[in-house]
Amino acid sequence: MSRTSLEVKAKRKPKFSARAYNRCPICGRPRGYMRKFGICRICFRNMSLRGELPGVRKSSW
């Protein structure tokens, strides 16, 4: 199935709640999803490096 059809399928309410899973709303990626921000790790990295996520900065120690 194409990515867009899988995104539409994921948005529907499943018959059983255990079947529901999160997808990144930007790219549609099902893995590496960060609940706190609601996006995948790759989109999180891109947005944080561009400064689009307030309060997030690159760590340094």
Swiss-Prot record:
Keywords (alphabetical) are:
Metal-binding, Ribonucleoprotein, Ribosomal protein, RNA-binding, rRNA-binding, Zinc
The protein's GO terms of the molecular function aspect are: rRNA binding; structural constituent of ribosome; zinc ion binding
Name the coenzymes or cofactors required. Zn(2+)
Membrane-spanning parts: none
Instruction: Report disulfide bridges, numbered on this chain.
Output: none
Cellular component (GO) terms are: cytoplasm; small ribosomal subunit
Query: Per UniProt, where does Zn(2+) bind?
Result: C24, C27, C40, C43
**GO annotations under biological process?**
translation
Entry superkingdom:
Bacteria
According to the record, cofactor stoichiometry and binding are noted as:
Binds 1 zinc ion per subunit.
Regarding protein family, the annotation reads: Belongs to the universal ribosomal protein uS14 family. Zinc-binding uS14 subfamily.
Q: Which PANTHER family match?
A: 30S RIBOSOMAL PROTEIN S14 (PTHR19836), SMALL RIBOSOMAL SUBUNIT PROTEIN US14M (PTHR19836:SF19)
Q: Main role?
A: Binds 16S rRNA, required for the assembly of 30S particles and may also be responsible for determining the conformation of the 16S rRNA at the A site.
HAMAP family for the chain? Ribosomal_uS14_2_B
Q: How does it assemble?
A: Part of the 30S ribosomal subunit. Contacts proteins S3 and S10.
Q: What is this protein called?
A: Small ribosomal subunit protein uS14
List the taxonomic lineage: Bacteria, Pseudomonadati, Thermodesulfobacteriota, Desulfovibrionia, Desulfovibrionales
